[in-house]
């Protein structure tokens, strides 16, 4: 394994360094080839490194940043005032080649805008998309995008997302000839928005995409598709609804419950069922798949949940490691070159793709 250097925006997210710094130490313990650049306020970071041993400290470097982009600031305002912020400095480290990827739990819109500004989209990609890999009931995985980077998406963007998601499923998740579906309100051809129907028509003409049609939201965790494509608004609502239901379900399994006194054998049976079911469904725990990759850029950027705990942020760091090792941006670029002649005409010097 080759050595990797990642830039962490340790000030971003709901909990800042209190979560991100311990998660960084956890990631270093798991990967001896990893070096981390901790971007943020040194006064907030240094005390949290007290438990780090000499070997860990040799693979850590604090990169000072003057400010933090708040989560409630509009992206346009955040970008204008971003100079010296921990998020921007972390992305600049990737741009300059000092880091191979950036991980942040900060403002999603600001991260999207700054990443596009500093790292630039791949040729043929109009706008990057947030993508994650979710577990399903058949113990496999489904790639889902967009999860919030683009609220409004036209058919061109949906087709581009399908191409990128297919590459990620094949190259990173290692699913041969992955099935691709569009999230819709029904399976019938006449259902859905014009953008979805137009994207469906184009996807049917691309030989390298194994397009299977529409999928409804209630089938997200069934394993019927390997890649699910939607606009960012729909994807974000779908993901957070699913996570809320899963967390509630796992919480109920662990709950001892209140009520009248039961016999010892009923209590024993209940505890056995709790442990058995918790193990059975533990793979659905959202903490295990935290970290959405901002796909379609000339560099690797991972967006962690703002409310991520230490374990979840460490998972996001691991997502960045995998994306770099599998050379995801380079593989997407190669696939785009082979796909575009079949259904796209590149305009504006390759900065955007338009359906023809």
Curated annotation (Swiss-Prot):
KW Cytoplasm (keyword) present: yes
Molecular function, one GO term: phosphate:acyl-[acyl carrier protein] acyltransferase activity
GO cellular component term of the entry, any: cytoplasm
Entries under Gene3D superfamilies matching the protein: Isopropylmalate Dehydrogenase
Recorded metabolic or biological pathway in which this protein acts: Lipid metabolism; phospholipid metabolism
The protein's Enzyme Commission number: 2.3.1.274
InterPro entries: FA_synthesis, Phospholipid_synth_PlsX-like
Predominant subcellular localization, coarse grouping: cytoplasm
GO biological processes: fatty acid biosynthetic process; phospholipid biosynthetic process
Catalysed reactions, as listed in the record: a fatty acyl-[ACP] + phosphate = an acyl phosphate + holo-[ACP]
Subcellular localization(s) per the UniProt record: Cytoplasm
Entry keyword Cytoplasm: yes
Keywords carried by this UniProt record: Cytoplasm, Lipid biosynthesis, Lipid metabolism, Phospholipid biosynthesis, Phospholipid metabolism, Transferase
The organism's place on the tree of life at top rank: Bacteria
Subunit record text: Homodimer. Probably interacts with PlsY.
Listed PANTHER family: FATTY ACID/PHOSPHOLIPID SYNTHESIS PROTEIN PLSX, PHOSPHATE ACYLTRANSFERASE
NCBIfam families hit by this protein: plsX (TIGR00182)
Recorded family membership: Belongs to the PlsX family.
Role, per record: Catalyzes the reversible formation of acyl-phosphate (acyl-PO(4)) from acyl-[acyl-carrier-protein] (acyl-ACP). This enzyme utilizes acyl-ACP as fatty acyl donor, but not acyl-CoA.
Name of the protein in its database record: Phosphate acyltransferase
Species of the source: Escherichia coli (strain 55989 / EAEC)
């Amino acid at each position: 394994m080759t050595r990797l250097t990642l830039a962490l925006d340790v000030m971003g997210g709901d909990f800042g360094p209190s979560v991100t710094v311990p998660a960084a130490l956890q990631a270093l313990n798991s990967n001896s080839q990893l070096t981390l650049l901790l971007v943020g306020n040194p006064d907030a970071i240094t005390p949290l490194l007290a438990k780090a041993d000499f070997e860990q400290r040799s693979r850590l470097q604090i990169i000072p940043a003057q400010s933090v982009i708040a989560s409630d600031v509009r992206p346009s305002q955040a970008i204008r005032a971003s100079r010296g912020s921990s998020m921007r400095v972390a992305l600049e480290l990737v741009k300059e080649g000092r880091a191979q990827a950036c991980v942040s739990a900060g403002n999603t819109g600001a991260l999207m805008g700054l990443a596009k500004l500093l790292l630039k989209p791949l040729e043929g990609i109009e706008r990057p998309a947030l993508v994650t890999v979710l577990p399903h009931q058949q113990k496999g995985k489904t790639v889902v995008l967009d999860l919030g980077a683009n609220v409004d998406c036209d058919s061109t963007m949906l087709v581009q997302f399908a191409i990128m998601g297919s590459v990620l499923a094949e190259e990173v998740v290692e699913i041969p000839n992955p099935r691709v579906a569009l999230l819709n309100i029904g399976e019938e051809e006449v259902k859905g928005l014009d953008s979805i129907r137009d994207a469906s028509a184009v996807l049917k003409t691309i030989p390298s995409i194994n397009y299977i049609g529409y999928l409804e939201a209630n089938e997200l965790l069934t394993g019927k598709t390997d890649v699910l494509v939607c606009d960012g608004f729909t994807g974000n609502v779908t993901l957070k609804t699913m996570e809320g239901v899963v967390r509630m379900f796992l919480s109920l399994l662990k709950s001892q419950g209140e009520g009248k006194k039961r016999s010892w054998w009923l209590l024993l049976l209940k505890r056995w069922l709790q442990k058995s079911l918790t193990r059975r469904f533990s793979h659905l725990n959202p903490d295990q798949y935290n970290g959405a990759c901002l796909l379609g850029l000339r560099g690797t950027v991972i967006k962690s949940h703002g409310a991520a705990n230490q374990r979840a942020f460490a998972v996001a760091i691991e997502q960045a490691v995998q994306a770099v090792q599998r050379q995801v941006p380079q593989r997407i670029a190669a696939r785009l070159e082979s796909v575009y002649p079949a259904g796209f005409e590149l305009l504006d010097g390759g900065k955007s793709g338009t359906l023809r």
